[in-house]
UniProtKB/Swiss-Prot annotation:
Species whose genome carries this gene: Danio rerio
UniProt name for this protein: Transmembrane protein 229b
A cellular component annotation (GO) from this entry: membrane
Localization per record: Membrane
InterPro entries membership: CmpB_TMEM229 (IPR010540)
Residue ranges that the UniProt entry lists as topological domain Extracellular: 39-43, 97-114
Region: Disordered, residue numbers: 158-189
Keyword Transmembrane applies: yes
Domain of life: Eukaryota
Key words of the record: Membrane, Transmembrane, Transmembrane helix
Cytoplasmic side: 1-17, 65-75, 136-189
Pfam families (UniProt xref): ABC_trans_CmpB (PF06541)
Family classification: Belongs to the TMEM229 family.
């Protein structure tokens, strides 16, 4: 009798990595859009710093913990306000630390409502919207991901050839009904 293995949730490090890449990508896209809106630059040059990987990955991982603690206690509007306040605190703290080493990649000194050039009130609405998107799309879907033991596409195809999967068969080892598998990740519905 074969033993079935239930796909495991992603580790904190795996989730951190996904959050870091998400934040990094969004930073590049935001700066490209900003450059277009402000300077009408059709090249859409998006920029960021490698520090953004650590900053966004850690920030969103902490927001994930907040989400898990707050989801049954308060509505999404209040949660997003809390996330936005946290984002300001995190941006100020990491910016202040990086500035000590002349490594802070942003400077909001030209904004009217900035504080020490590290945070600016003008970004309250974008941070709030980003918080909503992070909770509703990124965190909730990342928490649904499971890592399947069969990660190599060749192994999965071999199982299909041997009748270990495919139509009517299991999708991944121990995968639940309604789950889909691709590249070793199982998304549980």
């Amino acid at each position: 009798m074969a033993t079935t293995v239930t796909p495991e949730p992603l580790t904190a490090l795996s989730r951190w990595y996904l959050y870091a890449i998400h934040g990094y990508f969004c930073e590049v896209m935001f700066t490209a859009a900003w450059e277009f809106v402000v300077n009408c630059n059709w090249k859409f040059p998006g920029v960021t710093s490698v520090w953004a990987l650590f900053i966004y990955g850690t920030c969103i991982l902490i927001v994930e913990r907040m989400y898990l603690c707050l989801k049954d206690r308060c509505n999404v509007l209040l949660r997003c306000i809390i996330y936005t306040l946290w984002t300001y605190f995190w941006e100020f703290g990491t910016g202040f630390l990086l500035r000590q080493f002349n490594a802070c990649p942003w400077d909001y000194s030209e904004f009217k409502y900035n504080f020490m050039g590290l945070i600016t009130a003008e970004y309250a609405v974008p941070w709030f919207c980003a918080s909503f998107i992070v909770e509703r799309l990124v965190i909730r879907n990342t928490l649904r991901l499971r890592f399947d033991e069969v990660a190599e596409s060749g192994q999965a195809e071999e199982r299909l050839d041997r009748g270990g999967g495919g139509r009517g068969g299991r999708r991944g080892r121990g995968a639940r009904a309604g789950a889909t598998s691709a590249n070793g990740y199982v998304k549980v519905d």
